[in-house]
Amino acid sequence: MNILLSIAITTGILSGIWGWGAVSLGLLSWAGFLGCTAYFACPQGGFKGLLISACTLLSGMVWALVIIHGSALAPHLEIVSYVLTGIVAFLMCIQAKQLLLSFVPGTFIGACATFAGQGDWRLVLPSLALGLIFGYAMKNSGLWLASRREQHSANTAVTK
């Protein structure tokens, strides 16, 4: 069984579980899938990738709240929102000099989830966090399944 098929199987199973779990817990299922996406897209794998993804998602949420609350200070001057968005977008990219904030797409995913969740960080945060953990489980259980299948095939070939 190849790696892609193994990851597809575990992702399919765990996606169904996540969909049910998110609804049962009153979380945003779509935000959870953004958390999954962040882990899958992060160039680092394993625990390091999980940590980097978590830090960038969280920083994106904070930056989105800066834009939301900063824009609210001058609601009748739309230009303030545009300038603030430009400055924050610059900072979201430049922060990638730091290893734990080096996954720029994760930062933007966290910000977009916060905007889509209308700034309700108390709902967005656990949705993203659990989704991120599910993404970690999806990919790593798929890799485990593929390696187990490969070991089984190798053992079968040796005994023949």
Swiss-Prot record:
Gene Ontology, cellular component aspect: plasma membrane
Keywords: Cell inner membrane, Cell membrane, Membrane, Transmembrane, Transmembrane helix
One family name in Pfam for this protein: DUF1097
Superkingdom field: Bacteria
Bilayer disposition of the protein: Multi-pass membrane protein
Transmembrane portions of the chain: 20-42, 50-70, 72-92, 99-119, 123-143
Subcellular location, record wording: Cell inner membrane
Signal peptide bounds: none
InterPro entries: DUF1097
Family affiliation: To E.coli YahC.
Descriptive protein name: Inner membrane protein YcdZ
Species: Salmonella typhimurium (strain LT2 / SGSC1412 / ATCC 700720)
Gene label: ycdZ
